[in-house]
């Protein structure tokens, strides 16, 4: 293999750290005088810490987040562009989530789960019955999520069909739109 970049990780919470998970870069990939400048990428999370003599045991949601952010890291590490301004996640908003969504989707595939979701003491893979329950739970509260997407779409349509935005009061406009 060859050097493609450096990945730093900071996965556990601490008092001075903001919540959530994200990827960023100290240096983006680019070309300078026909020489590849390799990226320096970092992934940050706030995953469950190890306790006592037990390792960090991630929840399913934390595993999805880890895969998601690693997708962003791969996007940054595997860039091969001339200009830093086009490197990694410095792409159009509609594309920036593609690598991370692919990784997140893979994380929920049963055959992939069997590779990483193992009992920390026995090494036994996650049982098929538990995978089925996890998959079934993904449909829970789907009606609410659909209503949220529709509300955002209707609000967008109202904004984009305005003839003028002069003197518009944003909060009033959005309240009226969402109360239709």
Residue ranges and their predicted role:
Residues 1-180:
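Cation-handling catalytic/transport regions enriched in His/Asp/Glu
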């Amino acid at each position: 293999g060859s050097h493609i970049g450096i990945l730093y990780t900071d996965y556990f919470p601490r008092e001075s750290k903001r919540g959530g998970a994200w990827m960023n870069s100290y240096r983006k990939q680019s070309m300078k005088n026909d020489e590849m400048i390799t990226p320096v990428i970092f992934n940050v999370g706030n995953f469950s810490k190890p306790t006592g003599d037990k390792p960090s045991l991630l929840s399913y949601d934390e595993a999805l987040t880890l895969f998601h952010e690693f997708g962003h890291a791969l996007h940054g590490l595997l860039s091969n562009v001339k200009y830093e301004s086009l490197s990694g996640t410095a792409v159009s908003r509609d594309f920036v989530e593609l690598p991370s969504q692919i990784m997140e989707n893979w994380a929920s595939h049963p055959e992939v789960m069997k590779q990483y979701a193992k009992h920390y003491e026995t090494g036994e893979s996650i049982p098929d019955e538990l995978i089925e329950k996890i998959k079934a739970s993904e449909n829970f509260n789907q009606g609410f999520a659909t209503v949220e997407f529709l509300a955002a779409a209707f609000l967008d349509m109202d904004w984009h069909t305005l003839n003028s935005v002069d003197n518009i009061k944003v909060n009033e406009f959005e309240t009226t739109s969402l109360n239709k």
